[in-house]
Amino acid sequence: MSSSTLDTFPNPQPERDYEIAISCPEFTSVCPKTGLPDFGEIRITYVPDTRCIELKSLKYYMIEFRNRGIFYETVTNQILDDLVAAIQPRRMTVVGDFSVRGGLKTVVTASYHTKG
């Protein structure tokens, strides 16, 4: 995955801090150990600086994970890293809320904050 597949657009209100929340409730990837599909919801919350994420490109970016073997922890952090690289937000949190598997539920949260 790469932030180069993500399109952006200028923040229409760069002088103001405001929060954008995006949910991807049908996220899928593959367990790298078993090869079985993993299902979950990815929630992205961010305060933009000069750029915002274009949603159609974000949808296609998320689809790229569908057949990729990747751990929950890795995918959550990878999404955060790619989105931060694409838009350099003031702050961002990505939550991977994965479906129950083997009687266990996993939620992974990764955050980014600008220094200053």
Give the positions of each predicted feature.
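N-terminal intrinsically disordered, cationic/polar leader segments
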Residues: 1-116
